[in-house]
């Protein structure tokens, strides 16, 4: 009877999870046909939803009419910051630093959740995130390692490394504006939030 199912998994594990849900979905079709269901996939890999939808309908043989009328299979972007005491530590500290971006539309009331935010262009935003969040983060990790820092948090406080990170974002913005349908103002807002994340 769930309204929402969240699959916070590695990309390669999502099909297996959907396979395990098959029995429950078939039971729901028989006993609770009209109730709406949202399935959220929390992974950094992009452009997966259509393949997963085809997997549900073609491979798992979930009834198409029921699925199209009652199920929203959606992607999301988890914007978080993780730290550890050492690079080989198995215990991580993770905190949410911005709202969870969810591909719209969905079948539940997002307004009831403080940290949830719907987004109409999630695939594009996920691609952009790769350049505005991940590229300076990766540069910081690489250069920080060369400088002898143990953590990204320490490295990001170095003036020279911070300059390199900012240069990565500036270079990325040029390519993004020429490749994606996003305004400079929208991109600046997205990048500003990215910088807030990296500085936390």
Question: Can you name each region flagged by the protein language model?
Answer:
Residues 1-200:
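Substrate/ligand-engaging "lid" and interaction regions
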């Amino acid at each position: 009877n769930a309204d929402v199912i969240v699959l916070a998994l590695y990309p390669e594990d999502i099909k297996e999870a959907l396979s395990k849900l098959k029995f429950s979905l078939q039971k729901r079709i028989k006993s609770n046909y009209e109730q709406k269901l949202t399935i959220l996939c929390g992974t950094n890999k992009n452009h997966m939803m259509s393949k997963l939808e085809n997997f549900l309908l073609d491979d798992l043989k979930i009834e198409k009419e029921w699925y199209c009328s009652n199920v929203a299979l959606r992607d999301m972007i988890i914007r978080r910051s993780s730290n550890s005491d050492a690079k080989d530590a198995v215990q991580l500290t993770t905190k949410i630093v911005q709202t969870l971006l969810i591909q719209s539309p969905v079948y539940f009331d997002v307004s009831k959740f403080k940290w949830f935010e719907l987004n109409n262009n999630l695939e594009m935003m996920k691609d952009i995130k790769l350049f505005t969040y991940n590229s300076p983060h990766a540069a910081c990790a690489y250069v920080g390692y060369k400088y002898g820092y143990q953590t990204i948090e320490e490295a990001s406080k170095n003036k020279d490394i911070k300059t390199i990170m900012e240069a990565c974002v500036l270079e990325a913005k040029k390519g993004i504006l020429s490749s994606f349908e996003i305004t400079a103002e929208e991109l600046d807002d997205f990048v500003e939030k990215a910088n807030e994340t990296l500085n936390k």
